[in-house]
């Protein structure tokens, strides 16, 4: 410590190699310079919490009748900011201790004193890392702090530093208790002397602190921290307004979840389900990676969209999570990977799934709306959250051949109404319900009254095969060739061709179509269509194959099996044409056209020119014969 030339002013050297540490804070610790305001407001809130608590037992506190508040004054022309509170203030010793040493904070000492006295503070304090104040040096070269402690015999002091390794303290006249921080902004940060910008930052980070924040004569933080109140004390109207503020969604939420958790971790949360999936999620599901609820520590925003609070498949849930247990890195911008964070995530995930389960049971119509909007995202959890996999499967819903459009069935309901002798859960995947219901592969199941799940969500292609079975019932695509259709009989309306006629016909199909197919076999699944394509036992079904080709364009298509319905009139007519003249060129034209028609049903017909030419040939032949 050295004496300054000014009478009454003393100069001090920073402890803990402050010059290097301040450089670290300014250039490395905070990625957004606006954070300085959040930190200064948080410190002011701490000081107000302290004086409010001390006033309960200490009658000597000066200005005890003054309303507790934080006031910010701007000068856009001089580019200066003044932040003032009427909190507990500091003595000269506290100035040296709290502003002269990094990683030391009056808040931390205050909490320690309360703990030793076994008292509880009715309020929340932050700033336990002792660096928040110094973030102001990101935006200014010099800071002045004028303060007076709340004690009756206290004096006023002025602390000034340019972050160059020293600070000065001098005694001043100050009538009111509390602290006033003033500074001029660096040229590159003059925007922070504009009222709109400061209001923006307050609403973003400090909207829910316990005390009013005035910018000039206007109070900025007017919205209550609803999550801190009891669920029964919050009206639906308040929740809806809070959701609109939080999400910028003009529609009310579909539902909300109010949590207060105490145990190995303590946190409060207010979560919302949007009525519809946001457009950015509808078209870019990858945007889930950057979403998440807002994370607060004691009502101060730490992360706008905290990805660590929820698994990716639940990040469509909006809301706020607030904890006092979360350890932070030296900067509040970065949340540590910690057991506390992992525990919060685990508990939140379980609570949210319970929320969905209760909704499905007690409010099925609301759940149907939810599932229509967010079912695709929920399904992602099947392949990422193995802890809750069975619960996610229980929440899954599907349209089926026995539901109306827009209505759903669960796996449990499907199994309960399976036909006698049915041992498998059948599904059919494609682009839309109309296409699925028109597919030839569905004919047998429709004819027999066997329910088939209709999967038109692109996500289903990836997640359903991974389920393998439900209630010991294997899941099976109706495109597979290895389905046993013989156990219930064909019940064909027309008798099939005898083997002596069908085998030569199938051989001609193989010869005409060539090695682009694996085989041609007689069908037991077709009822009203002449042919269809199916996948081999170990092959991908057509929907999965198309998805894989979109991701890997060079991936070769697997050969399919062509099934031929030898009961169909077209096939019987072909057999008759062969018997009459097996060299008739029209026979091969019809065979090729039938195969291309099957490809068209699959959405895999690439060479449409040949298909149209053959169609014209067949029309010409049909019109000539009349």
UniProtKB/Swiss-Prot annotation:
Which protein family is it in? Belongs to the heat shock protein 90 family.
Q: Which CDD domains match?
A: HATPase_Hsp90-like
B, as annotated region: 333-546
Predominant location category? cytoplasm
Give yes or no: UniProt keyword rRNA-binding. Answer: no
Annotated spans, C: 547-626
Record keywords, A-Z: ATP-binding, Chaperone, Cytoplasm, Nucleotide-binding, Stress response
Q: Which NCBIfam families match?
A: PRK05218.1
**Annotated compartments:** Cytoplasm
| Region span, A | 1-332
Top-rank taxon, per record:
Bacteria
Alphabetized Pfam families for the sequence: HATPase_c_3 (PF13589), HSP90 (PF00183)
- Spell out the GO cellular component terms annotated for this protein, sorted alphabetically and separated by semicolons: cytoplasm
Residues annotated as transmembrane: none
Q: Which GO terms describe its molecular function?
A: ATP binding; ATP hydrolysis activity; ATP-dependent protein folding chaperone; unfolded protein binding
Describe its assembly.
Answer: Homodimer.
Family annotation (Gene3D superfamilies)? 3.30.230.80, 3.40.50.11260, Heat shock protein 90, C-terminal domain, Histidine kinase-like ATPase, C-terminal domain
Q: Which protein is depicted?
A: Chaperone protein HtpG
Report the function annotation for this chain. Answer: Molecular chaperone. Has ATPase activity.
